[in-house]
Amino acid sequence: MTVFMSDIRMAAQGGPGFGNDVFDRLLSERIIFLGSQVDDEIANKLCAQILLLSAEDPTRDISLYINSPGGSVTAGMAIYDTMKYSPCDIATYGMGLAASMGQFLLSGGTKGKRFALPHARIMMHQPSAGVGGTAADIAIQAEQFAATKREMAQLIAEHTGQTFEQISKDSDRDRWFTAQEAKDYGLVDHVITLAEGPISN
């Protein structure tokens, strides 16, 4: 079976090709937009878009704009791993709110190409998860949750230049940052004004 780029583009957007749809137009400029809670459906769309743009031109940057309260850890990690798998540099832009998994993806962009708009707010905290079932099931889930917490703290430490211990301490409760504070902390590299901000590659 032959799969064409237009088919992937259609699947990524959940509808037919470019037309007048604003998100299709953005995709044609190599701009991806995460503007909702992170779940499996959103993750599948974003992963497909990253893979599509990587296949179309592996030498050009992809811009990921983030205005998200966070969401599923596993869905977010699927996006993160696809970002790292792509041969393209992924420039990330925090706008509005980049919280929880939104913060994680923002700081996971290509070093030197992580931006925050001036009035963006960034929030970092430890991952959360509900547990249930038998006592044995709860113990297994708690062990997995602790491992995920350590893994994410280590990755954030690598992306920010902070120590693992500092990230673990700061993310124990909700930690809020202004755009400038996020830059000072290492979550982003630049704070840009609306006039300065690059819109496309």
From Swiss-Prot:
Protein name: ATP-dependent Clp protease proteolytic subunit 2
InterPro entries to which the protein is assigned, alphabetical: ClpP, ClpP/crotonase-like_dom_sf, ClpP/TepA, ClpP_His_AS
Organism the protein comes from: Corynebacterium glutamicum (strain ATCC 13032 / DSM 20300 / JCM 1318 / BCRC 11384 / CCUG 27702 / LMG 3730 / NBRC 12168 / NCIMB 10025 / NRRL B-2784 / 534)
Source organism superkingdom: Bacteria
Cited NCBIfam families: PRK00277.1, PRK12553.1
Active-site residues, Swiss-Prot/TrEMBL: 100 (nucleophile), 125
Gene: clpP2
Membrane-spanning parts: none
Pfam families referenced in this protein's UniProt entry, alphabetically: CLP_protease (PF00574)
